[in-house]
Structures are given as structure tokens and as C-alpha cells.
């Protein structure tokens, strides 16, 4: 049966678990890794836990993983408490099992016209929803959503539903840009911008950062709205302005990598074109938390689309190239999800129900290539992302224990084999 461990009662804290879950339970009871200091976005009593080492205006959506001798915690560092606005990607590290932590390190900074501390301000691109995994070679991978300036899914009417974000050029899917007349441009491997006839325009762009140039002249950022103001900002400044060519407004999948247990990080790299299909629409997003490195060395990351269907992508070369699951374009699950691997090799996916109730479950028997619907497990939770890990044939899942996002608990279940198939033994929590 499931056993329930109280984690954080009557709070709206995000809940995170690592493979050293008992260590993290103790640590989390004594230390707060990230804590907002703005009472507009967090209960004033909780902001008193914020200090110079862990504080910021607002934090949401954490991910925690062990890499070598280090614990790495990643999170959205926000200008407000919304799913949009100026959102950086931040981490902290611990090399003593969570007793002490490094200062906050910003590893991805979005371009912005404005960085106001208000949920009414969305004059910025943003990162959101990190998901970490450890590649077989030891590299730490973070997959995260990136949006050009907009409100993401919360204002779908301004997303570019009719603009293709990638075009086939030299046998490879390359990013596109559009001018105000709707003409498209393609960015080649070297960053040169080609027009719709694939002729070099003389413009170059660092696609992930978005900085566009004509020769040495700075033209603005392809991920921002607007055009050059009278008081021109310098390239690389905290705020800048929109370029005359713009990337389509939609979600993108950016990958960051660390080869030294989280001390230093690569620049974000767009991998969306490797796994996107037309049916996904304007949103193919990361299911935040942690990915899975299977017994066979395959790295799997959980995604989902706006219709709340799930997708898994995988890499067999330490995260260099990514592939979409085979067969049906969507996995048999719902919304944001997480996965664990049983000793039998089966992979169990736990989804996010549309309302309070049993947790939808899917299972893969071929290392994440295909998935089958496994019904619902008797793990009751509201509409909220879970965190789930496995140790042997035991499964530990953190989730709210209420019809709202409160009363966080960790429930413990067990995988078992029935008629040659793996299942999760999950009767109603006691």
C-alpha cells in the first residue's frame, strides 16, 4: 500500500525530490533553497525566509538532481509570479548533501524591452519550466521552454499559428524569421540570414540570444516586439528593442549543458526543430521536473502539447541529437507528467489529471519509443505537476494532498509484475 510522508503542510510551496529523498526532506525542513521576497507574490510571513543567498522577487517551478558529488537545484527566477514576464533560469549547487548552498547563479537570461515587477508587464521574452537529466557521459542537461515576447499560452491569439518556425534548408530544419510584410527568411548554420530565395541578405544573427546585425550595425532582437527607439540601447544591454525581422511567437525547446556538475553551463541551444511536428501547433512544452536516463543509457524528456496530450523525446548520444517517440505522435497520458523506470525495465509515466482525482498512468516497454494507456492509479491529487523517483521497485511521488495545491506529501508505492506486465501498486492512500 502507499505510505504518506508529510512534507510541507498548508503551503503553496513547490515540492521537489531527489534520489537522496530523505536527505532532501531533512534539508528542506531547515533551509529554503529559493525564496521570493516580494509580498505581492508570496505570503509576507514566508518572505522573511528570504536572504541574500536565496532571495529574489519571485521563484516558481523547481527541478532538483544529483550529479556526482553535487546537488543541483534549478528554477524560474521571475519578475512576477506569472507564467510570463521577465523570467531567468537560475541554479544553486550543494556539495555537502544540502547543508550549504552556493549563491544563486543565473544561467540563461532572456532578451527584454522591459523588466518591470508586475504581472501586467510582458515586454520580455522568457524561460520557463526546467527539466534536468544526467546523460550517460555525466553531463547535466536542462531542457527548458523559451518564448519570444508574449504571454505564452495565456494569450494564444497573438501566437503565430500560420507561420512555420522552421524550413528545410540543406537537408536540415533551420529557424525562420519574418518581416512585417510576412515574407520569410531562413537562418543558415553559420548565422547568415537568407531571404525566401535563399540569397544572403548581409544580415547575421545569434539565433538563441536573438541579436540581429547588418554588418557591424546592431538591428535589435528577433525575439522582441517593436522597433528601434530614438534612444538606441547597446547590444547586450539589460534591455533592448525589437529587430525588423522576428522569430515566430510560439514555444521553443532550449537545451543547456554542464560538463562540470553544474559549475558552468553552455549557452542555450534550440532543439525544437528536431522533434516538432505540425500537429503540435504553437505549443510543444517541457513537463518540468526531471527526465529519465534508462538502464540502457537512453535519455528521455517528458513534453506535452496545448491539447494536454503528452510526448516523449529521447537521445542516444548524450543529448546531442533528439528523436521523437515512434508510432503515434502522442503518448497515452495527460498534460504535464513525470516518469520512472521499474527494475523490469518498464517505464511508468504519471500524468496530471484535469481535476482532483486519480492519477493517469502510461507505460512503455521499449525504452520510451512507444507508450500504452495503463488507466489510472489510485494516487489522488489535484491538477498539479508531481515529482516522482524510483529506488529499486519502490516509487516515491510528491504531490498536494488536497483538492487545492496545498498539504504537500510524499506517497510511497511499489511496482510489481502481473501476467508478465509491470504495474504500479497504488491503492487509495491511507
Name what the model sees in each region.
Residues 3-10, 21-430:
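Asp-box/BNR beta-propeller blade signature and adjacent active/binding-site loops
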Residues 17:
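Polybasic, low-complexity RNA-engagement segments
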Amino acid at each position: 500500500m502507499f505510505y504518506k510522508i508529510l512534507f510541507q503542510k498548508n503551503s503553496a510551496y513547490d515540492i521537489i525530490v531527489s534520489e537522496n529523498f530523505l536527505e532532501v526532506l531533512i534539508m528542506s525542513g531547515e533551509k529554503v533553497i529559493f525564496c521570493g521576497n516580494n509580498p505581492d507574490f508570496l505570503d509576507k510571513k514566508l518572505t522573511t525566509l528570504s536572504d541574500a543567498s536565496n532571495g529574489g522577487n519571485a521563484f516558481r517551478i523547481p527541478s532538483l538532481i544529483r550529479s556526482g558529488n553535487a546537488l543541483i537545484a534549478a528554477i524560474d527566477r521571475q519578475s512576477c509570479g506569472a507564467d510570463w514576464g521577465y523570467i531567468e533560469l537560475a541554479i544553486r549547487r550543494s556539495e555537502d548533501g544540502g547543508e550549504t548552498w552556493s549563491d544563486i547563479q543565473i544561467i540563461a537570461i532572456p532578451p527584454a524591452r522591459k523588466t518591470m515587477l508586475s504581472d501586467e508587464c510582458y515586454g520580455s521574452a522568457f524561460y520557463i519550466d526546467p527539466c534536468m537529466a544526467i546523460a550517460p557521459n555525466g553531463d547535466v542537461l536542462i531542457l527548458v521552454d523559451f518564448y519570444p515576447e508574449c504571454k505564452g499560452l495565456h494569450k494564444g491569439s497573438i501566437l503565430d499559428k500560420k507561420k512555420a518556425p522552421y524550413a528545410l534548408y540543406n537537408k536540415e530544419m533551420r529557424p525562420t524569421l519574418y518581416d512585417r510584410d510576412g515574407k520569410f527568411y531562413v537562418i543558415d548554420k553559420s548565422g547568415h540570414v537568407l531571404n525566401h530565395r535563399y540569397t544572403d541578405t548581409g544580415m547575421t544573427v545569434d539565433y538563441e540570444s536573438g541579436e540581429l546585425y547588418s554588418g557591424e550595425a546592431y538591428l535589435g532582437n528577433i525575439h522582441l516586439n517593436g522597433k528601434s527607439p530614438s534612444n538606441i540601447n547597446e547590444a547586450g544591454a539589460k534591455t533592448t528593442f525589437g529587430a525588423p525581422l522576428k522569430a515566430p511567437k510560439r514555444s521553443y525547446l532550449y537545451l543547456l549543458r554542464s560538463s562540470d556538475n553544474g559549475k558552468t553551463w553552455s549557452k542555450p541551444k534550440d532543439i525544437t526543430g528536431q522533434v516538432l511536428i505540425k500537429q503540435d501547433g504553437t505549443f510543444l512544452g517541457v513537463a518540468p521536473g526531471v527526465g529519465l536516463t534508462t538502464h540502457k543509457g537512453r535519455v528521455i524528456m517528458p513534453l506535452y502539447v496545448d491539447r494536454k496530450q503528452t510526448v516523449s523525446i529521447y537521445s542516444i548520444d548524450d543529448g546531442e541529437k533528439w528523436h521523437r517517440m515512434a508510432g503515434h505522435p502522442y503518448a497515452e497520458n495527460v498534460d504535464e507528467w513525470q516518469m520512472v523506470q521499474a527494475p523490469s525495465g518498464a517505464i511508468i509515466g504519471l500524468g496530471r489529471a484535469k481535476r482532483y482525482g486519480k492519477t493517469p498512468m502510461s507505460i512503455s516497454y521499449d525504452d520510451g519509443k512507444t507508450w500504452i494507456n495503463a488507466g489510472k492509479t489510485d494516487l489522488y491529487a489535484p491538477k498539479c505537476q508531481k515529482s516522482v523517483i524510483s529506488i529499486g521497485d519502490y516509487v516515491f511521488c510528491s504531490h498536494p494532498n488536497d483538492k487545492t495545491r496545498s498539504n504537500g506529501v510524499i506517497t510511497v508505492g511499489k511496482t510489481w509484475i502481473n501476467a508478465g506486465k509491470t504495474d504500479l501498486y497504488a491503492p487509495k492512500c491511507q
